[in-house]
Amino acid sequence: MRFERTNTVLCTCLLLSLVSVGWGQAGGPERLITGASEVSPLANPTRSRLEFDSSDARLVEGFNRAKRQAMAYVFDKDPVGPWYEAAEPGREAFCMRDVAHQAMGAHALGLARYNLNMLRRFAENVSDAKDWCSFWEIDRFNRPAPVDYANDSLFWYNLPANFDILDACYRMYLWSGDLSYVNDPVFLNFYNRTVTDYVERWGLSVDEIMTRPRLLNVRGIPGHKKFQSARGIPGYDEGNHEYAVGSDLLATEYAAFLAYARIQETRGNADAARTFRAKAEEIRTLVNTKWWNDEGHYFYLRVGKDHSLEGHDSGNLLYWNVVDDSPRLKSAVADAGSRRIEVLYRYGDPDAARERLLDIMTPGRSRMEYPEVPFSTVGAVVNGTMGINLVAPSALLSGVEGGWVETSVRTLPALGTHIDWAELRNLPIRANEVTLRHEGNRKTVFTNQSGPALVWYAEFPGSHQNLTVNGKPVPARVETLPLGRAVSSVRVTVGAGGTVTVSAPE
């Protein structure tokens, strides 16, 4: 999951509840707390079948609150087509960054066709006149949101957006199996323009990015107060107006190049896939060498206006998985991990992740009324707590590997020491709907409720010679995850309507 995904994902959004100041009739200040109301389950006719249960009552309560809030933001009868809110509350709109970071939670809630429509709206609106940008934010009337767009010369745009959306499109292809993502000419044009023309127009190639000016392609009225300095912000940080490149720009570009390569593999374009895997590796090498401060043992945060590297924060790089598994990774996790739920789950600290997750679920402690928070919370439970992720080997291997399947399910329980059991029901995965139950970190039960047979990799922490599958010992495969963590797994086929139980030795 991506917590949402910000360099921020669960980070930028997990803000404290907004407190605003109004004025009473007598002219004195009156404190108004926004987002304090409970959302009724009947607030929106769209229903989600996703259910979560656990020995951890606080986690269940928080999940259900997030689910209700997220589903209250779902709409189906506006000119833009099926959509959910993914912007500041009250905008009646969805922006590129937030959609990319909410998409996983939305898919889990059963909103695959909403994701497809919204992502396609962004894809269809890239244009030469906007220097291959799309509309940063689209409202329910299928217009560029007026608050962010005046015309093709004057508009708000954060440059990681194209990359973030491309990566989200590939992820949603994996989870939904919808071939529109890899065959629709509208999507293909967006992908192609993003990794070529967009990169060239905005000076984002590896050879240029470290020396690019902060602003390029300045158009419109000189000195325009709002849009002139915001048409091509080189990161998601909107508070600093001096930097030339944010680490999130490189991190999202890396993710986009990899996603593009995988899409080309799916389409059988081996040469293009190899080219963009190599481009992704060039970015990864740049980050792990030039952006690393060897003396201070940290990654830099940005390129400043004088083109020197400055600041430090590894969160962006860890979120998009750019950091090599080396001593740098341990330092990076220590530097930024405690602030990012997904990073805590990914690198093996489920107890800390749970505490952070419970904190943002607590009413009055987080901006639950901000759409990214509830959607990302749902995604965090799916990908983090339950450890459910999809694996997609290269499609180019399909002709040489006898056991190749396009997509398989991989689970690694992350209940930690405070959760005895947890169960997620009715999770959509491509043409299937599944239920997964973890009993501690040593036993998992997988039910293929509907759809064709699935390949499931059941993983458990530690090095084990055998795992038990439906009561019978089966040789396990032992792998080493980043930071030297051993996991043992077995590959199991779960037929339609079937249930398989896998357990590890105590």
Predicted regions and their residues:
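Low-complexity, Ser/Thr/Pro/Gly-enriched N-terminal "stalk/linker" regions
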Residues: 27-94, 117, 286-287, 291-294
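Boundary at the C-terminal end of the N-terminal hydrophobic targeting segment
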Residues: 22-26
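Bacterial N-terminal signal peptides
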Residues: 11-20
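Bacterial N-terminal signal peptides that target proteins for export
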Residues: 1-11
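Acidic/aromatic-lined carbohydrate-recognition and catalytic surfaces
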Residues: 166-169, 173-191
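The feature captures the catalytic groove of carbohydrate-active enzymes
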Residues: 81, 85-91, 134-164, 171, ...
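Non-catalytic C-terminal accessory modules of carbohydrate-active enzymes
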Residues: 348-506
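Active-site core of glycosidic bond-cleaving carbohydrate-active enzymes
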Residues: 62-64, 92-127, 185, 189, ...
